[in-house]
């Protein structure tokens, strides 16, 4: 019974992942006791469920309470569509039987808070200092910074040598400063009206520019490369994946575990731009596969001028297109930075 309830909650819209409260909670008859020929009189009955909390006997009330803590909090999981039962089992063992897949001590929480302050502080400064300038800020998506921090640290601790990032304009300036390590003074100079570009280089707007740096992690130094990006949304994806493939070949990385791509998307472009479907379809092929990609979709619930899901796509979630390659999908409430970091840790594992 508990496993059935858990499986249904995996794929239903019951997690608290909408910080704006715009999505209506759907009624799911499958999750009602009566649907399974049970009543409140059965809540004290005990059941032993294989691979759930070490198969110990629990009351139905405790089983449901545990599953609700897992599947109705700030993290939502979609993995029951995956054909490989080992992957499904890994997720179930990882997330069920405890309120959250990870817990943080006070030092870790303080670090997450500091990164949020860094992210929000930059946006507030740019908004007040350059009020009329285009900057495509990260307001509302500040959790992206500690999320990327976690990906870099956790991949580095596992021996990854290079991370190649691709993203569009939204939040790019924040990532350049707070993740990539670009000097704030360089960015502020680019905002200045009297800024003169280097005549030996072609000009471009500041939210298109790439950057590279080396970041020290617990596993050693990791090279970060953020690809330059035009205004054509998602077109950078195959460029980043091609760069990763070349770097793997150069390193003789046949296991494809030394260079990892991280692609960041907007909700509307991820579900609508054809190049996304192309890179997904080619991702498992021998010629073009790179061993896996971390896709991060920052969903601000408005695609350009389209705010209603019914006008933007035909699927329930913008990430549903990734199901065609059996990719696990983790939804997270952007107002919960700790949950965002947990999602990053799950992605690395």
Feature locations, PLM:
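Active-site loops and adjacent core secondary-structure elements that bind or stabilize anionic groups
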Residues: 9-10
């Amino acid at each position: 019974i508990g496993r059935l309830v858990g499986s249904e909650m995996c794929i239903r819209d019951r997690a608290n992942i909408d910080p704006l409260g715009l999505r209506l909670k759907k009624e799911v008859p499958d999750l009602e006791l009566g649907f399974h020929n049970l009543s409140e009189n059965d809540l004290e009955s005990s059941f032993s469920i294989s691979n759930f909390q070490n198969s110990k006997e629990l009351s139905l009330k405790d089983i449901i309470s545990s599953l609700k803590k897992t599947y109705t909090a700030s993290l939502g999981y979609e993995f029951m569509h995956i054909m490989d039962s080992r992957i499904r089992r890994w997720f179930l063992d990882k997330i069920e039987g405890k309120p959250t897949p990870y817990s943080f001590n006070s030092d870790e929480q303080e670090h997450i808070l500091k990164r949020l302050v860094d992210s929000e502080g930059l946006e507030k400064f740019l908004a007040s200092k350059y009020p009329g300038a285009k900057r495509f800020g990260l307001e509302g998506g500040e959790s992206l910074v500690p999320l990327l921090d976690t990906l870099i640290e956790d991949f580095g601790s596992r021996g990854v040598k290079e991370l190649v990032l691709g993203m569009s304009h939204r939040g790019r300036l924040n990532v350049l400063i707070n993740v990539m390590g670009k000097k704030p003074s360089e960015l502020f100079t680019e905002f200045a009206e009297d800024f003169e570009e280097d005549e030996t280089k072609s000009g471009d707007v500041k939210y298109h520019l790439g950057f590279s740096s080396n970041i020290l992690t617990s596993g050693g130094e990791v090279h970060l490369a953020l690809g330059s990006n035009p205004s054509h949304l998602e077109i950078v994806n195959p460029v980043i994946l091609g760069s990763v493939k070349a770097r793997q070949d150069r390193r003789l990385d046949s296991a494809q575990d030394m260079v990892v791509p991280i692609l960041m998307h907007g909700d509307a472009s991820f579900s609508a731009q054809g190049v996304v479907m192309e890179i997904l379809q080619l991702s498992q092929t021998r010629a073009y596969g790179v061993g896996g990609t971390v896709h991060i979709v920052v969903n601000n619930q408005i695609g350009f001028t389209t705010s209603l899901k019914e006008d933007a796509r035909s699927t329930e979630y913008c990430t549903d297109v990734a199901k065609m390659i059996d990719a696990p999908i983790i939804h997270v409430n952007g107002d919960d930075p700790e949950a965002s970091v947990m999602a990053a840790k799950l992605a690395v594992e």
